[in-house]
């Protein structure tokens, strides 16, 4: 299942500006601990480019969200309201693309834009994940397309 996170963010901006403004202006902490690797990051759920205001990244993974003990008390309820509104948009079947991957199928996506999930599965399967740094990706792209 795939959801265009930028589309969902734009829909939130149009339907609930207060929630949109909250999710673009508050930095949230994220942590992932596999036992072998501990990753920490922070940033707004919806990140806008500081130069032109376009969407640059969606951070939306409830499993990696750290405790909210750094938020002001009065902001906790606002955070959860905004998160509920954004979640409702992403959970709307009209905003989701569902498909079944066949064996040998490769799926490449922009992880900063495309939200992804899956449903239950019975039987055997093997999934392999691979991540490419956006700095590396765009650096190589710029080098390959640079006109001297």
Residue spans of the language-model regions?
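Active-site environment of non-heme Fe oxygenases that use a 2-His-1-carboxylate facial triad
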Residues: 1-148
């Amino acid at each position: 299942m795939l959801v265009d996170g930028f589309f969902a963010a734009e829909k939130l901006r149009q339907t609930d500006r207060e929630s949109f403004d909250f999710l673009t202006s508050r930095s949230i902490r994220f942590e992932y601990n596999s036992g072998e690797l501990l990753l920490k990051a922070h940033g707004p759920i919806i990140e806008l480019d500081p130069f032109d205001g376009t969407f640059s990244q969606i951070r939306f993974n409830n499993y990696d969200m750290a405790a909210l003990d750094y938020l002001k008390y009065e902001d906790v309820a606002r955070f959860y309201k905004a998160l509920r509104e954004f979640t409702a948009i992403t959970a709307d079947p009209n905003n989701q693309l569902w498909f079944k991957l066949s064996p040998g199928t490769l799926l490449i996506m922009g992880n900063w834009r495309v939200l992804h999930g899956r449903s239950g599965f019975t039987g055997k399967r093997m999934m392999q994940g691979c991540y490419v740094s956006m700095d590396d990706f765009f650096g190589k792209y710029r080098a390959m397309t640079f006109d001297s």
